[in-house]
Amino acid sequence: LKPITTEPVLTQPEGKLVTAAWYGKGFYPISGYSRIFSHEMEARATTYVNQGDTAIWIKNSLTEYEGEQGWIRISKVDNKGNWELRTPQAIMVRTNSKNEKKTFYVTKLGGSTPAAVNERGYTVGNNLNIRFRMDSKGVLSQVTTDGSEILGLTDGEGTWYPYGSYGYKYIANEDTPVKKPANLEVTKYVWANTINKQGSETIHTFVNVGYSGNDIYMSCPADTTLYFKGTILGNKVFFKSPQFMGVSKEYNRLLYFSGVRFAWDDNSPGGYKVSFVTGDIIFDYDATSHTLVLPKEYAIVAKVFGHDTYNIYASPSLRIYPFIEKAATPQAPQFWKPERNFRNYTYDERIQKGIAQVQFIISPHDVNGEYINPDSMYYRMYVDDPETPFTFDKIDYPALPKDEMTEIPFWFTDKEYIMGYTNTLRLLFFFTEVQDSIGFQSVYKGGGETRESNIAWYKLPKTTSIQGIHNSNNGSPAKVYYDLLGRRQEGLRKGINLIRKEDGSVEKVIQ
């Protein structure tokens, strides 16, 4: 290749940093380049540098590449709205196992269409430009969206590594986000939202609330790092709608607080219909209890900038009130779709263990239905014996915060063996032998006391036979090796090794 730039630009160029919603399509390899997946993104939060009449600089231009990427220049061509991304441009330097450095480039791919991705039917060339247009509203878009002009990842010899992106569009956002005063003290409030037409089902979450004179700052239920602002006037609180809360790192979106007129409607998608409000959303306010109540004809949504999508975080009958922690007895867990439990028991060659799964719901409510603090909740697992909680350890669960634990925090997940599908639904994989039944118990440590729920038991059907990891299981290895942190390894290595034997015992060996 004959690159336009030979070194990646890793320092942010000078110019105006613009927050934007980013659209695009692309593809990326998996399983050692044996397969290629395509993807499409809509309204992803990003930033770019605008240098006015000369250039725009974008970063992370290869949408699904996870390593650090340099800034890429899009140059202005004329005063008629034409811009172009000239390639090849250096985007990164990587060091291989031999400590050799290699420069990679973004290069226009030509000679094919996305249909040929799996055959890698693209060609790579020099001085190939990808065309862009800037409209009167400042929206920067790639001219072609069909994949005939693709930005790909190549090395200096022109070899294509199967990453590619196309259909770029950047929608600038000029709004200033609401900022909570730096020293403002906030307290925990309950956001209690009725979610069905009958008013019989309420979900709860926490938001942070702070007061500065007559101003009230409240965190977004979707992301408590973002805030919206209201003004207290007598027994009312006025919230401007819409107002920009900022970029949610959790969802990678630009979010707005918005009010909507809301009505249940069985003939509409989702069973309701909404219309967005421009102006003020007015809450009733009790200054004594510091409770806010939303009138029934309104709802609160988190609206995604640059897109039609939104999430409803308050349908009618929303109440927001201070949380006061007190001692409480939690509800017992519930097994979710128990017919699925244990049925996927297999011997996993990758981790060299027998493995089974169980799904259950742990609710942050006490036995009277009152919301309790999930940050103060834990659960225990029992195997056959109601007197002895199961001990989780780092050998089977390497991501545990402690070497051994009998109580798992409500929010803990390692995204592999202990997973949270929702705020309350848990999927847990385990590697121990179960003869008769398995149980779960909720524990709440609040108000200066520790209280436990009843144990919820799931009894294995008589037709189910769960063999534990102590069995050789069709010739599986009798010994499994770990390092001191509980990470699996192939055989003995220099240093301290842990060996789990076929009988379940663990031996420490120093090599």
PLM regions with names:
Residues F430-G448:
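Beta-strand-rich modules
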Residues I58, M218, T464-I469, L485-R487, ...:
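Terminal processing/anchoring signals of secreted or surface-associated proteins
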Residues L1-T19, H39-A43, T144-N193, E201-T205, ...:
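Edge beta-strand at a domain terminus
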Residues A328-F342, E449-L485:
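Residue-level detector of functionally pivotal "anchor" positions at catalytic/ligand-binding pockets or at interdomain
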Residues M41-V124, V209-V274:
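Predominantly extracellular/secreted and cell-surface proteins with exposed
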Residues L498-Q511:
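C-terminal tail/sorting-segment detector
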Residues V274-F276, K402-R426:
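Aromatic sugar-binding surface patches on proteins
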Residues Q352-M405:
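Solvent-exposed loop/turn segments flanking beta-strands in beta-repeat/beta-sandwich domains
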